[in-house]
């Protein structure tokens, strides 16, 4: 991306929520966005997910240029998926897990069956009977695993992760991060991780941006991430 500028309305005017001069993320890389609340990190993720369209600049995603003010079309709708901090953002509380997992494939006209859904669940350490449960019958860590499985149903090339472990206790956080690390090795997909926690980003990412008040404060490579996390 080049000269990305994201604005929001404020009263009768606008304010700039995010400015990035240039950013390039390689295929198969895990890239981190670090910052506090209101820093602009989640704003960037929403632009890349097609959820926020009021921006200016040049953005190319998986080889395809994005157009401001336009919804994703074609392959991008399948190739870009997102995992939220709150799994209920993608899991309907009144739907069994079976329905939530088959929905992405059903909407896109792709085949699905219980056997493939069970295999997906077992791959992330969840038993087959999870299909018949409701979200509230699962622990927070189990719900997040289901949300990850749902995001992977369309075999995306880019997985956007918005604070996926911040609501979990430390042990479960480590389990989810290790799961994401293993999935990345297996699939080769690109991941972009948003987090306020330096250690979380250092655990998973190759490089990162440190963002504050909508501006890039620091560009961090693997060594810098490890050093800052060690001193955190």
Label each PLM-derived region with a short phrase.
Residues 34-36:
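The feature captures the beta-strand-to-loop junction immediately N-terminal to the Walker
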Residues 49:
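Helix-to-loop junction immediately C-terminal to a conserved catalytic motif
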Residues 65-81, 95, 99, 107, ...:
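ABC ATPase NBD coupling module
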Residues 114-129:
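Conserved ABC ATPase "signature" region
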Residues 134-138, 142:
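Conserved ABC ATPase signature
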Residues 201-203:
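A short, surface-exposed alpha-helical micro-motif characterized by mixed small hydrophobic
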